[in-house]
Amino acid sequence: KIKSGWERLTSESEYACPAIDKFCEDHCAAKKAVGKCDDFKCNCIKL
């Protein structure tokens, strides 16, 4: 049960911005993009 909550949190990584940039980076890395926090949203920038 904890795992599903954690996956939900990491999949909604913008909620971690700007507190935890790593969530945003990891979330975007899975999409082969670079994650940057923009206020409270996580933006994935394609390379």
UniProtKB/Swiss-Prot annotation:
Q: Which residues form the BetaSPN-type CS-alpha/beta domain?
A: 14-47
Spans traversing the lipid bilayer? none
What is the tissue specificity?
Expressed by the venom gland.
Q: Which cysteines are joined by disulfide bonds?
A: 17-37, 24-42, 28-44
Sorted UniProt keywords: Disulfide bond, Ion channel impairing toxin, Membrane, Neurotoxin, Potassium channel impairing toxin, Secreted, Target cell membrane, Target membrane, Toxin
Keyword Transit peptide included in the entry's annotation: no
Q: Which GO terms describe its cellular component?
A: extracellular region; membrane; other organism cell membrane
* InterPro entries the UniProt entry points to: Long_scorpion_toxin_alpha/beta
Question: Where does the record place it?
Answer: Secreted; Target cell membrane
**Where does it mainly reside?**
secreted
GO MF annotation list:
potassium channel regulator activity; toxin activity
Tell me the protein family, please. Answer: Belongs to the long chain scorpion toxin family. Class 2 subfamily.
Task: Summarize the protein's role.
Answer: Blocks voltage-gated potassium channels. Its application (10 uM) to cells recombinantly expressing channels results in membrane damage and cell lysis.
Instruction: Please share what else the UniProt entry notes about this protein.
Output: Negative results: has no effect on voltage-gated potassium channel Kv7.1/KCNQ1 and Shaker channels (tested at 10 uM).
Question: What information about domains appears in the record's comments?
Answer: Contains 2 domains: a N-terminal domain that is unstructured or forms an alpha-helix in presence of membranes and a CS-alpha/beta C-terminal domain, which consists of an alpha-helix disulfide-linked to antiparallel beta-sheets.
- UniProt-recorded name of the protein: Potassium channel toxin TcoKIK
From which source organism is this entry? Tityus costatus
